[in-house]
């Protein structure tokens, strides 16, 4: 609506802001289709609350929307031309769900990186698998970034071993005897290559979601001089 291409009345934007500022949250069913031709069912429940119908979450309780609005001095929305369709025919719900899932996925990735460092510490791996010169040989941004994060996490670790210290001490006397694995466990030393593509996928997902979040998703679209044009939803 803020791009001024939906043709809604300013009261629509005002009441949405009033709901957010007063922490009034419309109750929306957990189950129901999204994205077929807009998130019709879910957005309709939000629109119901704006006109004083349905129920909302307010101050930790589920109450009628009209009651919460009265307590905050908010007048129920009076729908004008274009308001009803604009409120119900969009992708706001699935975009919001996508944003929440993205935030949770980023948190899981962060935990996975930290857990990988911990596992390498448990088995006393050599730390060169995450070295900057090694990972810079591959031009995959995700791999390079995951390796950097791992180095940052284990910077003060006393459990990871240095290959140059244990295998190449400079002693030319007796032939060296390998007392530990020459390389860490395969699944552990390949963490940058495994989690790197995950990071790149999340970066691409964020790009798409941010673009959708800031897009005009309406039909018809009204330009700033008042002309309307219809389009097929994509």
Pin down the residues of each PLM region.
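Active-site cavity-forming subdomains of large catalytic enzyme subunits
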Residues: 1-140
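Accessory "access/gating" subregions that flank catalytic or transport cores
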Residues: 120-233
């Amino acid at each position: 609506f803020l791009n001024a291409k939906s043709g809604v009345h300013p009261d629509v934007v005002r009441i949405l802001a009033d709901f957010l500022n007063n922490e009034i949250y419309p109750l929306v069913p957990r189950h129901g289709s999204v994205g077929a031709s807009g998130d019709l069912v879910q957005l309709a429940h939000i629109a119901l609350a704006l006109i004083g119908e349905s129920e909302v979450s307010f101050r930790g309780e589920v109450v009628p929307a009209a009651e919460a609005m009265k307590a905050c001095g908010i007048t129920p929305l009076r729908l004008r031309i274009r308001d009803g369709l604009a409120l119900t025919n969009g992708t706001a719900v699935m975009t919001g769900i996508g944003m929440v899932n993205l935030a949770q996925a980023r948190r899981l990735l962060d935990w996975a990186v930290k857990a990988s460092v911990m596992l390498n510490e448990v088995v006393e791996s050599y730390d060169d698998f995450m070295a900057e010169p090694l990972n810079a040989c591959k031009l995959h941004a995700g791999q390079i970034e995951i390796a950097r994060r791992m180095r940052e996490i284990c910077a003060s670790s006393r459990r990871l071993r240095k290959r140059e210290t244990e295998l190449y001490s400079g002693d030319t006397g007796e032939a060296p005897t390998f007392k530990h694995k020459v390389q860490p466990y395969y699944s552990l030393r390949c963490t940058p290559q495994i989690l790197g593509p995950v990071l790149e996928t999340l970066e691409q997902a964020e790009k798409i979601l941010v673009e959708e979040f800031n897009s005009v998703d309406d039909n018809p679209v009204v330009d700033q001089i008042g002309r309307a044009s219809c389009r097929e939803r994509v």
